[in-house]
Amino acid sequence: MGKGFLDCESLVALQEMALHPIDLTASGCLSEERIQKNSLSAEGFTYSYATERVDDRCLEALQGLTEERELIKQMECMQQGAIMNRIEGFQSESRPVLHTATRAWVRDQDLHEEAAAIARHSKEEALRLAEFLYIARAKFSTLVQMGIGGSELGPKAMYFAMQGSCPSDKRIFFVSNIDPDNAAEVLREIDLEQTLVVVVSKSGTTLEPAANEELFRQAYQNKGLSIAKHFVAVTSQGSPMDDKSRYLEVFHLWDSIGGRFSATSMVGGVVLGFAFGYEAFIEFLQGAAAIDAHALTPKMRENLPLLSAMLGVWNRNLLGYPTTAVIPYSTGLKYFTAHLQQCGMESNGKSISREGKEISFRTSPIIWGDVGTNCQHSFFQSLHQGTDIVPVEFIGFLHNQRGLDCVLSGSSSSQKLFANLVAQSLALAQGRDNANSNKRFKGNRPSSILVAQQLSPRIAGSLLAFYEHKFAFQGFCWGINSFDQEGVSLGKELATQIIGIMSGNAPVEFPEARGMLRLFNVLT
């Protein structure tokens, strides 16, 4: 849609500006006026980008780029069910992208055709979930969720995000890795009779959950317990797992819901509803749905995910920074960056356009990070004085979740936490001169700060959707398909062949793999 990324007139202007971006170390640069002007408050968040290397001219050009690339129109098309997961002229999944429809039913929205159908089915599944939870929460004390990728990362991140603000007497575990030690660790911790096992696989054939399900089924058989009374499936209709004779209950999702965008479907619904109750899950959906609507705001400087996306494009494509660090100053978000790695890098780590052509510019940065203040004492040395400049996205909250705090030396721990967040952003931006070169901080290291009052279920849902839409906007801008993941398939295909060699049933010759296996089998 619109002009190609490299054909945009705004990009030419931005390239000129990138030669001499604003100097954040200049005296008076971070004035009160700039701080107030370069901020946006919406949907329970305040977003500060005064410490990014942008000025009004740059922001106007970025707005122009959003218009030339028709980003809002593309977002509208996505939410209404257009075929956004496609590569023109080549075999591809050719599907709509409708994770937003899984939460659209909690607010009034005029949806078309398949989007309306997915919203309707999502409501039906949610109502079935409410009935199921009424019985399951009374009967079971523990839940184990089995899944890989988006079937684990998003739900796990959101479970821990909500854990501090939602009282719960339930124990939750996640099993994802095909490494049997992962399953063994969890089996040691649980009472099988009190445990509900949720197996998540859209296709019903995913290797990792299939292997782990078999390990758990064997454990239940060895205990003489009924498997069908303890196991729940979340899968597509008609998949091999869509079998009520093998499961206590089967919940459904659809082809148009990508794994990394599935936390607001039953992929996240069963575990979050079991852990915190159905109402907490609905609050979570409401937060996500609010950002879905907000993401359609036309003006970039009034649209949280669009603004963040375009600042990311500026940092990646114009200033040339290869990585982005996401640093939440919240223990509840300790698994959130891992989810963002998948959501961002699996979506936009592409080198082919939607027209099937090789592209000649940078796409997704490497996304990484950890929880503050912990990481201030590990990799922040490199952020401040290393040879690579790393844009940082700080996330913070004014109040902690659990209510426990103390005052030491005149300030609470929550105040100290937030003070450190702000201090790091300013230190990166302004730096500090010193005659001792070892103590010199050059500054001009960009960052942004996203703050909410407290990490609640609603804010967790909004934060999830904020980043989903940020990455979608960036993919739209670059003209790539953010909704497939062909890069996952080659390694899986080769692994299947190597498993055949190891089991003595190799379907094809694979001398390189045999050579590798001979090298390492010497250790046995």
From Swiss-Prot:
SUPFAM superfamilies: SIS domain. GO terms for biological process: gluconeogenesis; glucose 6-phosphate metabolic process; glycolytic process. Its main location: cytoplasm. Keywords: Cytoplasm, Gluconeogenesis, Glycolysis, Isomerase. CDD domains: SIS_PGI_1, SIS_PGI_2. It is an enzyme of class 5 (isomerase). One of its GO terms (molecular function) is monosaccharide binding. The active site is at residues 346, 377, 492. Transmembrane segments: none annotated. Its EC number is 5.3.1.9. It is found in: Cytoplasm. One of its GO terms (cellular component) is cytosol. Pathway: Carbohydrate biosynthesis; gluconeogenesis; Carbohydrate degradation; glycolysis; D-glyceraldehyde 3-phosphate and glycerone phosphate from D-glucose: step 2/4. Gene3D superfamilies: 1.10.1390.10, Glucose-6-phosphate isomerase like protein, domain 1. It catalyses: alpha-D-glucose 6-phosphate = beta-D-fructose 6-phosphate. InterPro entries: G6P_Isomerase, G6P_Isomerase_C, Phosphoglucose_isomerase_CS, SIS_dom_sf, SIS_PGI_1, SIS_PGI_2. PROSITE patterns: P_GLUCOSE_ISOMERASE_1, P_GLUCOSE_ISOMERASE_2, P_GLUCOSE_ISOMERASE_3. HAMAP family: G6P_isomerase (MF_00473). Catalyzes the reversible isomerization of glucose-6-phosphate to fructose-6-phosphate. Belongs to the GPI family. This is Glucose-6-phosphate isomerase. The lineage of its organism: Bacteria, Pseudomonadati, Chlamydiota, Chlamydiia, Chlamydiales.
